[in-house]
Regions:
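Cys-dependent protein tyrosine phosphatase-like superfamily
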Residues: 1-117, 122, 130-184
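Ser/Thr-glycine-rich phosphate-binding loops at phosphate-binding pockets of nucleotides
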Residues: 127
């Protein structure tokens, strides 16, 4: 079964269950609505926001918050969509406890048949770090997780760009198995 990508720069980690990519809103309300409706059509029930409070206002023009619009659009279809913010500073990795919290949230959502969308600003650095650590949690080595992430992102229009973006983020992935509470 083929699973559509809702908008540019998104990619399925687990088709129909775990989607990743960039900030789903926009500075244009109509574009934001189109993107959010596309997430709903993909069955997304949980959105995990890795951006920091206020980060979207730093764009020029500033991006609009999306949670209210997402809930309104989901309500029209009778679908319940939750959002949770677990912030990571741009270009950085979270603490091991922070990454465990993010991965536990993803695991719970998938286990309860609630497809999840994980995003940061551009969908490469923080999002790539989370996806690669998720793959390590599933049994891949850090380097294997990074290679698999590269393959998963090939369908994204920015898939040719490095993800995670920084060497520190990539090193975090390589070390993740030592910090994952599932392995301790």
């Amino acid at each position: 079964m083929e699973f559509a990508l809702p908008f540019d720069h998104t990619f399925w980690v687990i088709p129909g269950k775990f989607l990743a990519g960039p900030y789903p809103g926009s500075h244009d309300p109509d574009e934001a609505s189109r993107r959010l409706e596309a997430l709903i059509q993909c069955g997304i029930c949980l959105v995990i926001d890795l951006t920091r409070e206020g980060e979207i206002r730093q764009a020029d023009p500033p991006f609009l918050p999306y949670a209210e619009t997402l809930n309104r659009l989901a309500g029209k279809t009778g679908v319940e969509v939750s959002t949770v913010r677990i912030s990571i500073r741009d270009q950085e990795s979270p603490s091991p406890g922070g990454m465990n919290a993010i991965l536990d949230e993803i695991d719970r959502s998938i286990a309860t048949d609630r497809p999840v969308y994980v995003h940061c600003w551009g969908g490469r650095g923080r999002t790539g770090t989370v996806v690669a650590c998720y793959l390590v949690r599933q049994g891949w080595s850090g380097d294997q997780g990074l290679k698999r992430l590269e393959k998963l992102r090939q369908g994204a229009s920015n898939g040719h760009l490095l993800s995670p973006k920084t060497e520190a983020q990539r090193q975090f992935v390589r070390s993740w198995r030592n910090w994952d509470r599932r392995n301790i």
